[in-house]
Amino acid sequence: MNISKQTLERALDSASFPVVAALLVHFTGDISILDKLPKPNQAILGETQGFLADKDKEIIKEIALKEINRFFSNSKADEIYIPSNTELNKMMNFIVGEEVSTDYIPMMLNDLNIATHPFKPNFIKATSNLEVLIIGAGMSGILAAIKLAEIGVQYKIYEKNNDLGGTWYENQYPGSRVDIANHFYSYSFEENHQWTEHFSRQPELLDYFKNCFHKYDIHKHTYFETQVTDMKFDELTQEWSVDSICHGRENKERIGIVISCVGQLNQPKIPQIKGLEHFQGDMFHSSQWPHFDAISGKKVAVVGSGASAFQIVPSIAKFSKELTIFQRSPPWMFPNPQYHEEVDDRKKWLLENLPFYSRWYRFLLFYPGSDQLLDSLFIDPTWKARSDSINEANDAMRELFTSAMLEQISDQSLVEKVIPDYPPFGKRMLQDNGAWLEALHLPNVTLLSKEVECMSSKGVVSSGKELEFDTIIFATGFKAQNFFYPINIDGGSGSFEKIYRDSPSSYLGITFSSLPNFFAMYGPGTNLAHAGSIIFNSECQINYICSAIKYMLSNDLKVMRVKPEIEKQYQDRFDMRHEKMVWQHSKVSSWYQNSKGKVVTTSPWRLIEYWNWTNNFNQDDYEF
């Protein structure tokens, strides 16, 4: 590999210097070099320079130029030094400016995956007649297909839409983008060094999953426009009887194992507003954005101010004649100036060409965003200072986020409308680069802290006054508590929906005592609101599922279901932990909760806990 000194020098100007410092161990084979370099401070989410002073960055850059050029003058890329696990741990400590707990080292090493050669799936030829049905071709479904193929298990995918992508296919509204840094929001084994933005927009994310879909030949096993409608487990044949509709034709078949990859956020939720059917203008949910222009020069209403509205409003405000937002409660926002920033070409070059740079950069994004926040999300029962915070640390964050918002507000009438009255992190935390509040200051934009009372043929009635609109957008979220809807699933003891309603019971959010030979990805209680990315959780889940299937095949077992007592123990611990956390606070109402105010969608666990549980399949937890 030939790297010019000039190219490297230019690229290093855009580098993360804690990462570059750690790379010097690879290039020199000397762990002690870290003792001679300026030390980064403790890493925080989104800060990739370790708060190093400019002079310290220059010191690291100068040494890096010397050592990297020396290495490539005398060695080949595949001769680079692979540190021992002990040395890798020291490198981790250096990069994040603190001692990485020994509890986390196996998980971080697993994700880091330092090896001389990039990941190549080792697909095994199928040796059994088992065929697994995967429902859904979104992020989790694609992942499940890749991992099943790796262990030699046949599969097919039924996807209700006419294309793949799930969330990133359906949510094509203006401004749609991920709110987890892209170099971590990706499969751990399938890096993309060419992301154009740090938090990519929907089209680029969809392209990423399409590339994975075709790279791993998943298209050969996928049936689009196929909606599973009913599933019933037959105890006699020990198989699922599955009904589906494919291109309008009904189909019935028998399947040994089913993996649901439908997720939680796929059924649009439109509020039941009196007179909804009378409105004569354009009206749609944010995830069903039309292909015609319903915005330009129009009077537009956006109902909701959560994650989707937060992205839509700044994107359409300048094109609308008038834009009115109906807000039930304001969101908390995490200051993030990088939210809309592009990844410059020099950063892309480092990620693509400097060995292990991308792996360590991913680690630097991962670790500060893993479990450090979780302790501050537990309610301190002695905390009496304020009702809009739950403990001292949470209150400090409330002050920080409030100050960041106040600095952006020149119209004082907005203050009461945009500062939440519930604790930070009680609802989904949004990424703030100033675009939301800037849009609210535009002369054609109005924020109303009022709910829609009813609708008329011309628009909306609120506070007894009719407001006329050409277009109404419902940014009102999804039916997250209706797990597996609209599929009617009966594991032999009755309909899953009728048994559990909106209070499902599961083990790890993956298996269910009432549903044999059935697994879920992004199932109940596995949404992440404090750490990581949903892809991390999905990788945990499919590793567990594959371990279970391999155990069944190697022991010639046809049926497995989690023991009811194991499920109950897990669910009791899940519920008890949530009782102490911010998401079940008395001032919080969100899609994390069911109709009784009980959290059912979101994980209360540390990532390391969940990784350990899913990394160790225990057959004693199951009946076969």
Positions of PLM-derived features:
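Extreme N-terminal leader/targeting segments of oxidoreductases
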Residues: 1-130, 207, 251, 269-287
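C-terminal, flexible cofactor-proximal segment of oxidoreductases
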Residues: 1-18, 24-27, 32, 50, ...
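Feature captures the FAD/FMN-dependent oxidoreductase FAD-binding
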Residues: 56-101, 197-265, 454
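Conserved N-terminal/central alpha/beta ligand/cofactor-binding core
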Residues: 58-67, 183-213, 217, 363-420
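Rossmann-like dinucleotide-binding core of oxidoreductases
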Residues: 122-129, 134-150, 154-164, 169, ...
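Catalytic cores of eukaryotic secretory-pathway lumenal/extracellular enzymes that build
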Residues: 169-216, 229-239, 256-293, 338, ...
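Central helical "cap/lid" subdomain
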Residues: 272-283, 460-510
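C-terminal catalytic lobe of FAD-dependent flavoproteins
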Residues: 375-457, 462, 466-488, 571-624
